[in-house]
A protein has these predicted regions:
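Structural helix-boundary/capping segments
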Residues: 1-26, 30-43, 108-139, 184-240
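Short, solvent-exposed loop/turn segments at secondary-structure boundaries
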Residues: 25-29, 61, 165-167
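General small-molecule cofactor/ligand-binding pocket signal
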Residues: 46-51, 190
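Short, surface-exposed recognition loops and adjoining beta-strand edges that mediate ligand/DNA contacts
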Residues: 51-59
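Short Asp/Glu-rich motifs
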Residues: 58-60, 164, 201
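Charged, often glycine-rich, active-site loop that binds/positions anionic groups
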Residues: 59-73
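Short, hinge-like loop/turn segments at secondary-structure boundaries
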Residues: 64-68, 169-171, 207-209
Length: 240
């Protein structure tokens, strides 16, 4: 692995998905990532634009598939066989109090959404369709990787935000729009800092084909070795 990290990117074909720079991306993020791409070009990488047309459908599919898996996996969390427990006079109260106390708001939200998506009458309408979208997204990545070795793109359409600045679930979900397709497709990815906006970091993600984790790390490590963003520690609220 260490040998792989030091091989650089000269001659590698790096794809840039045009859909990851669509309307809604912060202009500062766009500039930072474009500068990172130029750094790769200067290091000998071959840069080419690619298309992942189903990117816009990934968010909706993910927030059906992920809550469904959450609901299914956490159904066993009862405080008896799994997890912490709050003892109560009755078994039912033990279940209810344990799950209420130890599940956070977002977990509860996902359990409810997932239970709904998997319920009778809605499985085909939601979960099955979401899995079909997932398959399409995975196939698009497979097709793109026939022409490039790896992808480079923004990690998020916005820079990191201050803790507590956002509490609305929808706006939080939208911050994941550029990493969710990678998760749905089951691909290795790594994020590295590529700039700061008002003291808050901007992320660059590297995406590689399945089982090519070493390649993703190699491309990311090459960028870190050529820049100093990863070594900066800007005080919050102070422009870097």
């Amino acid at each position: 692995m260490r040998t792989e990290l030091g091989r650089g990117v000269e001659g590698l074909r790096l794809g840039v998905p045009r859909e990851y720079f669509a309307a809604g991306i912060d202009e500062g993020v766009r500039r930072s990532v474009e500068e990172a791409i130029e750094t790769y070009r200067s290091l000998g990488a071959l840069i080419q634009e690619v298309s992942l047309p189903s990117t816009g459908a990934a968010l909706s599919a993910y927030y059906i598939v992920a809550p469904a898996e959450c609901s299914s996996n956490l159904a066993r969390y009862d405080g008896v066989r799994f997890g912490a427990r709050i003892a109560s006079p009755s078994l039912l109260q033990t279940y209810l109090r344990t799950r209420d106390e130890f599940f956070g708001a977002e977990v509860k939200r996902r359990v409810m959404l997932g239970t709904y998506a998997l319920s009778s009458g809605y499985y085909d309408a939601y979960y099955r369709k979401a899995q079909k979208v997932r398959t399409v997204i995975a196939r698009e990545f497979d097709e793109v990787f026939r022409g490039v070795d790896a992808l480079v793109a923004p990690t998020s359409p916005v820079p990191a935000f201050v803790i507590g600045e956002r509490s609305d679930p929808l706006s939080m979900y939208l911050c994941d729009v550029l990493t969710i397709p990678v998760n749905l497709a089951g691909l290795p990815g790594v994020s590295v800092p590529c700039g700061y906006i008002d003291g808050l970091p901007v992320g660059l993600q590297v995406i590689a084909p399945r089982m090519a984790d070493a390649l993703a790390l190699r491309v990311a490590a090459t960028y870190e070795a050529a820049t100093e963003w990863h070594a900066l520690r800007a005080p919050l609220g102070v422009a870097a």
